[in-house]
A protein has these predicted regions:
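Short secondary-structure boundary segments
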Residues: 8, 47, 118-120
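Short active-site oxyanion
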Residues: 39-43, 69-72, 113
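Short, well-structured N-terminal submotif of metal-dependent ribonuclease cores
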Residues: 1-45, 54-63, 89-95, 129-132, ...
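A short, hydrophobic/aromatic-rich structural module that often spans a beta strand
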Residues: 51-78
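Acidic, PIN/NYN-like endoribonuclease modules and their adjacent C-terminal/linker elements
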Residues: 3, 17-21, 26-27, 110-158
């Protein structure tokens, strides 16, 4: 079964309450994918995602964490900290995006097919794909497809 690493923004947007048009659209796509499409995938997340969600405003974080209660956690493999540091050292991720580097390292090291996120600045960013491919090739790691829920909704979904 195809594997998907669930990054922090997915459960966060599922419970998002802001009403801007973009946020409303992302929330709807997240809920549609989670409620209908996720069953076709093997889902994983991490302690990093749970820790980030735990920092969310009261109520939202606990609801987002509850959404992940049955999702297995990926553990840190040997070399995890080195891979995370390598991404930052080689400017794939800025120094203040250590959590994003951790999500990417976990998804890569565990050979995830997809990394699902709404973080289009640091993760689902087409401008970073080639750079990530080069770095992961040097490390002997596969490159997960980094995408948003919109891209994993089947074309025949009504």
């Amino acid at each position: 079964m195809t594997s998907v690493y669930i990054e922090t923004t997915i459960p966060s947007y599922y419970h998002e309450t802001r009403r801007s048009p973009m946020v409303t659209a992302w929330r709807a796509a997240t809920r549609r994918w989670w409620d209908v499409c996720r069953h076709g995938y093997q889902l994983f997340t991490s302690a990093y995602a749970l820790a980030e969600l735990d920092l969310a405003p009261r109520g939202k974080g606990s609801r987002a964490i509850a959404l992940l209660k049955d999702v297995p956690l990926l553990d840190e493999m040997p070399g995890f900290e080195e891979v995370t540091a390598y991404y930052i050292e080689h400017r794939l991720m800025p120094r203040d995006a250590q959590g994003d580097a951790a999500h990417l390292a976990l998804a890569s090291m565990h050979h995830m097919d997809f990394l699902l996120t709404w973080n289009c600045r640091h993760l689902a960013n087409a401008n970073k794909v080639q750079h990530l491919s080069v770095l992961n090739a040097r490390l002997g790691l596969p490159v997960p497809v980094i995408t948003t829920p919109l891209m994993l909704i089947p074309e025949n979904y009504a």
